[in-house]
């Protein structure tokens, strides 16, 4: 059984026992988290939401909080001796999917 959930402005296809990286959640490591915005549930029978499936949820456990690799941007204007170098590390949360309730 699999589901498509919406979290952090993104849609993710998840299955039970799978680890997924989502946008940062304010939850401590080891705590349970529930995703209520389930857009689609597939498997033996499919359920399509409009926009969400009523009564469906996905439960998971937070494994890790961290930051992704650094992304460097460089802005440059020719002949003006003007340049800017900046970096950014996007925070993420790693979640182990425990169950899909549909």
Swiss-Prot record:
Task: Tell me the Gene Ontology biological-process terms attached to this UniProt entry.
Answer: translation
| Domain of life of the source | Bacteria
One CC-aspect GO term: ribonucleoprotein complex
**Entry keywords, A to Z:** Ribonucleoprotein, Ribosomal protein, RNA-binding, rRNA-binding
Gene Ontology molecular function, alphabetical: rRNA binding; structural constituent of ribosome
What the entry lists under PROSITE patterns is as follows: RIBOSOMAL_L21 (PS01169)
Quote the function comment for this protein.
This protein binds to 23S rRNA in the presence of protein L20.
Annotated family: Belongs to the bacterial ribosomal protein bL21 family.
Oligomeric and partner information: Part of the 50S ribosomal subunit. Contacts protein L20.
Instruction: Supply the name of the protein.
Output: Large ribosomal subunit protein bL21
* Native species: Pediococcus pentosaceus (strain ATCC 25745 / CCUG 21536 / LMG 10740 / 183-1w)
Q: Which gene encodes it?
A: rplU
């Amino acid at each position: 059984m699999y589901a498509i959930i919406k979290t952090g402005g993104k849609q993710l296809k998840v299955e039970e026992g799978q680890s997924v990286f989502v946008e940062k959640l304010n939850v401590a490591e080891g705590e349970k988290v529930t995703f209520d915005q389930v857009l689609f549930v597939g498997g033996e029978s499919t359920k399509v939401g409009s926009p969400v499936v009523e009564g469906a949820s996905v439960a998971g456990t937070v494994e890790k909080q961290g930051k992704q690799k650094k992304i460097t941007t460089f802005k440059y204007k020719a002949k003006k001796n003007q340049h800017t170098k900046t970096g950014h590390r996007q925070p993420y949360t790693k979640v182990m999917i425990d169950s899909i309730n549909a």
